[in-house]
Every structure is written in structure tokens, then in C-alpha cells.
Amino acid sequence: MRLSRYFLPVLKEAPSDAQIVSHQLMLRAGMIRQEAAGIYAWLPLGLRVLKKVERIVREEMDRAGAIELLMPTIQLADLWRESGRYDDYGDEMLRITDRHKRDLLYGPTAEEVVTDIFRASVKSYKDLPKNLYNIQWKFRDERRPRFGVMRGREFLMKDAYSFDLDAEGARKAYNRMFVAYLNLFSRMGLKAVPMRADTGPIGGDLSHEFIVLAETGESAVFCHKDLVEMAAPGPDIDWYGDLQPLVNERTALYAATEEMHDEAAFAALPEGDRLSARGIEVGHIFSFGTKYSEPMKALVTGPDGKDVPVQMGSYGVGVSRLLGAIIEASHDEGGIIWPESVAPFDVGVINMRQGDAACDEACETAYKALQAAGRDVLYDDNDTRGGAKFATMDLIGVPWQLIVGPKGIAEGVVELKNRKTGERHSAPLAEVIAQLSAQNPGKAA
């Protein structure tokens, strides 16, 4: 993409009401624009990152055996009355009446809809297990939306729902999602710690939140320090084998959100192992048995010929929220430092002397060669000063900057800058193109 043709409305300063770094930088980098309280338009740069985050989530769900479908944003109120949750959400639920006076709602979550889909189609234990997932926009009418995409009213969520015959099968489904979450957050450069959590209005008796530590986190969290540096399991997993040891390894050490915190148990840890911090929730998983299947009569015929309600689980990831969490965890005074897997562009080509024949030719060569190699390239071909070009590339977080100037061209070299480390080195253009072409930022962990 040539910057001269791109839509990138960057700001020199963030609006005064942007309180946290991620909100400030997303506005300054031209990623989002507020349309109403807690509601944002996703501009081209922000949408590019959102789609890359979504792609990783989708790949890890598919790898773990979940099956994608797409459920409506507008849901029947009667389904929520059937589950008994219609009044639980109170004013956070946006309720709608259509022209036929039917009660509808803008879905804050989708347990009722997916249970309705399941019960209409699956009747026998022989058709289990199933795990269905949905990536869809949700709406919750927050009393005080703030912090940009971190606590908006409209947001993109991935919700997966598992259906099993018995508690043993349900626990295996829970473990698969637990491990899949470790991998997907790791691929985005996040160190997410699973913590025992309150089930809230979703319900159930087993729940973990996945927390990214950050000074601007909305809640206090407490954990053993070793959990922060534990490596993700990676893709080479027998998803239908015994994953309990992997889960045990990450749940044996103390970790809890503020609601579940046990001060005595935490104090029993050696002082040097205790970590108290603020955290951002990026994922939440639940096992809730028959909370929805029983009242909604999602039944299957078991091996004994008797009908039983299925055991269910729910597994959520705040896809749009993840962008804010990544920025909170990875930025500097110059702007965003995207992990390469989710960066809007892999490489920024900077022409320091637009209109100089040799510089123009070298930039065109690099731009076309890197595009042909499958890299996402942003070519700053604007006739502006070099300092402004560097500032823009740093602000939007392009991981690699290929800098072409008349002095370097005369010496037969270009400069390559690493956004994360700030390191620069000079090399012949062909060598730099080969290095950048060989990288695969989207590769699985």
C-alpha cells in the first residue's frame, strides 16, 4: 500500500478524554474514531490489525476442533426468558421491539441462541461431542463506557460452546479450550495468566479468566510469579488425548482474580514468589453443566435410551479488546510496538528523497519484491521530511522500517530498523529484501 493513497488520519495529540495509553495511541494512529459513547468506527489501519487478531483466534479454534458458525446479533427475548436470564442483565441489555411488537434484544452473549440451534438438530449421544464457535459483534449498554475498546459498548467477541454427554467429556472440552487459549494469546505476544475466576451471570462451577498484567488493568490480581513466564504448549498437541497435565501445570500454582482471592493461601507463598498486580481480562472460560440445557430442554438420548440434558461450556475471547491489551503491554514513547503476528503492515518502506531517481527506483524495487513475497508493505512515498516519516512509522508500530536515502544509495546500501529494539544496520538492498521476504510473522506458535 502506498501511503499517498492510503487513508491514515493520524493525530499529533490524543483527545483529552482518552485516559489510558491504548486509547490514546489507537486514536492518534488513526485506528479508530468514536461515533458515540463506547461505540467506534474501525478505520483501515485498525481494521487490518483486528482482522489479523481474528485470524489467529480462528486458527487456534479450528486447530482445537471447534466448528465455526455465525449467529445473529439480534436475538429473541423469548429464548432468554426460557433460560431465566432475561432479567439478569438489567440495563446492560439493549432491548428492542420490532414493528410486530415482538420483544427482541441486541445480544450481549449467545448461550441461548446456540442452545436453541443445538437442541433442534442433535438428539443422540452418538452425535457428541460438539464445539461450536461464533465471532460476532456484541452490545452491552455499559453505564460508564471508557478506556476506548477496552470497555466499549459495542465489541467483537469470539464465543465457543461445547456440548458433551457427561461431566468427564465436558472437562475434556474445557481443557482443550484452556490449552488453545494459551496458544492463541502467545501467538499475539501476550503473556496471559489463567486465574480462577467468579462465574458471574454466565453461571457454572468452574471458570478461569486469562489475564494480561498491565498497570492500567481494571482489577487487582494475585499469582505466583513463575506463571507469567511459562511458555505456551505450542501446536504439536494431541487435542483428544489427556490434556489435564498441561492444565494442572498452569493451575497448581496460586493465581486468582480479586473476587476469588484467598489472602491466607497467597500469604503462604514465599515472599519472593508473590506477585500482586493489575490485570486486563482477555479471555474467560466456563463449565456450567446443565444450567442452560436443562431449562431449555437441550436433551440427547443416552446409551441407556433415556433422555438427559447435555453438559455445556462457554469460552469467550474479547477480539476487539485484545488490540487494547496488546498496546498496553507493548508500547513506548514513540507509539505502538506491534508483535509481528498482528502488525497492520510487516514492513514500512521510507523514501527519504522522494523525486530522486535512484531513491525512487530502489523503493519501487523493494516495494514490489516484498509484496511478491507475501509481505504486507506500507510505502511512504509522500514528499515530506524524514522526521515526520519516522514518527508515523513508529506511531503505527510497523515492525521493520526499510530506509532509502541518497547517501546510502550512493554507497550501495539501505538501512533496516527494528521497531521493537531500535537497532539499525546497513546492507545491500537485495540482502535486506531477502531477509524480510524469508520472515513469516503469521506462523503458529
UniProtKB/Swiss-Prot annotation:
EC number, UniProt record: 6.1.1.15
Localization in the cell: Cytoplasm
Molecular function in Gene Ontology: ATP binding; proline-tRNA ligase activity
Keyword field: Aminoacyl-tRNA synthetase, ATP-binding, Cytoplasm, Ligase, Nucleotide-binding, Protein biosynthesis
GO biological process: prolyl-tRNA aminoacylation
Family: Belongs to the class-II aminoacyl-tRNA synthetase family. ProS type 2 subfamily.
Subunit annotation: Homodimer.
Physiological role: Catalyzes the attachment of proline to tRNA(Pro) in a two-step reaction: proline is first activated by ATP to form Pro-AMP and then transferred to the acceptor end of tRNA(Pro).
Protein name in UniProt: Proline--tRNA ligase
Source species of the chain: Caulobacter sp. (strain K31)
